[in-house]
UniProtKB/Swiss-Prot annotation:
Protein name in the entry: Rap1 GTPase-GDP dissociation stimulator 1-A
Keyword presence, Endoplasmic reticulum: yes
Subcellular location: Cytoplasm, Cytosol; Endoplasmic reticulum; Mitochondrion
UniProt source species: Xenopus laevis (African clawed frog)
Gene3D superfamilies reported for this sequence: Leucine-rich Repeat Variant
Designated gene of the protein: rap1gds1-a
Origin organism lineage: Eukaryota, Metazoa, Chordata, Craniata, Vertebrata
Length: 607
């Protein structure tokens, strides 16, 4: 430490009137002290006031510049010294040094600026004001094809500097993207794939930039997919593959890049990783299995990439994914079910899969998770079944396969995501399937659960789906038994509330179901309809100018049917329905206008 004090005194006395020979010893002493105890030495250097002297030496473009920049780089390793470096005015002369032709000067300057910018807003702002990032980007562009070790080392430092400059700062990352840094980094990855340090730095840079939506288009315009898959194939170490995964996940959110990754052979790589890790109990392998299978599912979210991998149901990838369903590994079961849910995003695929007996594989999987099962697997398998049930030709086949019975086993689930998918699957299955709707609709436990879930205000999705299934059971069965079951379970009030939904489709479904109730079982339901203030709701819907034509039409149909009940008829008479309905006779929609005339006649006759 005495040597450090002596060196600092000597530097203060000499000032900027230095020659390299005279001060080399002092600078070496500072570097040695910083290497031995960075925290203590850097604080001592700052307290001595020598940082301002460094700014003057750097400004003078002295031959000492590279040594001074080196010292600044070491000082800035101490996070407490970064702001003092900015306050001492070191950034402007350091940025000017970026114009140097001397590689050692550029190397130490890049290190100094990178260290000052690390987690330091003031440092970044100062570099931004001096235009430092653009100079570094230009250097990288011009040096990209140089493969000598010193150039590769400098490019690694420059990449690191840009990352420290822009890390977790959207506006600075956007600035780098606008400067065209992405194609440069992709080229660097391609040319220098043998250089571990430089490729890792490029990957870290990609990881930072790929999170930004504005970066995706630029990435899609490069051969990033090809380069990164090529690199992935070479990697055997967990840590290296993990870095690549961190880049792939945000990139794969873009549909164009999804397709590029599929064409570059990423899926085959991921399947290999799954194969290698599936039976391992090591934490690293378990994590890698999850990441690989999750990424596979993400690639299937793109319509084009999904169809390419489906290959008419004959693709090897599709077949491999199917083999995951009977696996004993929950992660693979989950990924397999999610993959099928994604493949089942168009009718053609769904029809092929149902004809290929995939439904039974999903039912077998669900059956393994009925008692204390894995919620994510339940949710994924139900998602797949729901999607498969959408095409009309699949419904009867799936009902025959026992899908409804299997799904109903999960009625006791207390997990909203499972409840939501269960409801959606049943609703899809009974669409235009009168017999199934009647059979399922008479299930008292289901009706009770639906009524309970119709009140799940904390889970809007579950609440909405419960209401829609209640309505669907009535609309598709047109069964008195189903209506009585729903009346006994207390479901009527929820259908009336559903008629006031902000979604027109739900309003209409509720009104059609209520119309059937009034037509088929009015006496059984009249008390509940009166308690739920049905007539008031219908009056409001007809008065509301925002109500869609089909809402007005079905409200009037329901009014006519409801008048068959004495208490409901009295309610109708209390409100000025005639006035409202007569105005609707001139409605621009002919069907509404005709129904208004019929309703007016009925109101007049029965008033």
């Amino acid at each position: 430490m005495d040597n450090l004090n002596d060196a600092l005194e000597k530097l203060k006395l000499t000032g900027t009137e230095c020659t390299s020979d005279k001060l080399d010893g002092c600078f070496d002493c500072l570097l040695q002290a910083l290497g031995h105890n960075n925290t203590e030495s850097s604080e001592k250097i700052q307290q001595s006031g020598i940082l301002q002297l460094f700014a003057s030496i750097l400004n003078s473009q002295s031959s000492c510049a590279s040594k001074v920049a080196h010292i600044v780089a070491e000082i800035a390793k101490n996070e407490l010294m970064r702001i003092p470096c900015v306050e001492a005015g070191l950034i402007p002369p350091l940025v000017q040094l970026l114009h140097s032709k001397d590689q050692e000067v550029l190397l130490q300057t890049g290190r100094a600026l990178g260290n000052i910018c690390y987690d330091n807003h003031e440092g970044r702002r100062a570099v931004d004001q001096e235009g430092g990032a653009q100079i570094v980007v230009d250097h990288l562009r011009s040096m990209c094809t140089l493969t000598d070790p010193s150039s590769e080392k400098l490019m690694t430092v420059f990449c690191g500097m840009l990352m420290n400059y822009s890390s977790e700062n959207d506006s600075l990352q956007t600035q780098l993207i606008q400067m065209g840094v992405i194609p440069i980094l992709v080229d660097l990855l391609g040319v220098h794939s043998q250089n571990t340090a430089l490729t890792e730095m490029c990957l870290v840079a990609f990881g930072n930039l790929a999170e930004l939506e504005s970066s995706k288009e630029q990435f899609a315009g490069t051969n990033i997919a090809e380069e990164i898959v090529k690199l992935f194939k070479k990697q055997t170490e967990h840590e290296k593959r993990e870095i690549i995964f961190e880049v792939l996940a945000p990139l794969a959110e873009n549909d164009a890049i999804k397709m590029q990754l599929v064409e570059a052979g990423l899926v085959e790589c991921l399947l290999d990783v799954v194969q290698q890790t599936v039976n391992s109990e090591k934490d690293d392998d378990i994590a890698e299995l999850k990441t690989s299978s999750d990424l596979m599912v993400l690639l299937l979210l793109g319509d084009e990439s999904m169809q390419k991998l489906f290959e008419g149901g004959k693709g090897s990838v599709f077949q491999r994914v199917l083999s995951w369903l009977p696996s004993n590994n929950h992660q693979l079961q989950l990924a397999g079910a999610l993959a099928i849910a994604n493949f089942a995003r168009n009718d053609g695929n769904c029809i092929h899969m149902v004809d290929s007996e995939i439904v039974q594989k999903l039912l077998d999987l669900l059956d393994r998770h009925v008692e204390d099962g894995n919620v994510t697997v339940q949710h994924a398998a139900l998602s797949a079944l729901r999607n498969l049930a959408i095409p009309v030709v699949n419904k009867a086949k799936m009902l025959s396969a026992g899908v409804a019975e299997e799904v109903l086993k999960f009625l006791r689930s207390e997990m909203p995501p499972v409840q939501f998918k269960l409801l959606g699957t049943l609703r899809m299955l009974i669409d235009a399937q009168a017999e199934a709707a009647e059979q399922i609709g008479k299930n008292e436990k289901l009706a009770e659960r639906l009524v309970e879930w119709c009140e799940a205000k904390d889970h809007a999705g579950v609440m909405g789906e419960s209401n829609r299934l209640l309505s669907a059971l009535i609309r598709h069965s047109k069964s008195k038994d189903v209506i009585r079951t729903i009346v006994q379970s207390g479901g009527i009030k929820h259908l009336v509330t559903m008629a006031t939904s902000e979604h027109v489709i739900m309003q209409n479904e509720a009104l059609v179901a209520l119309g059937l109730i009034a037509a088929l079982e009015l006496q059984a339901a009249e008390h509940d309809l009166e308690s739920a203030k049905l007539v008031e709701v219908l009056h409001r819907l007809l008065l509301d100018e925002r109500s869609a034509p089909e809402i007005k039409y079905n409200s009037m149909v329901l009014i006519c049917a409801a008048m068959g009940s004495v208490p409901l008829h009295k309610e109708v008479q209390k409100l000025a329905f005639l006035d409202v309905v007569s105005k609707l006779r001139s409605h621009e929609n002919k069907t509404v206008a005709q129904q208004a005339s019929l309703t007016e006649q009925k109101l007049t006759v029965q008033s």
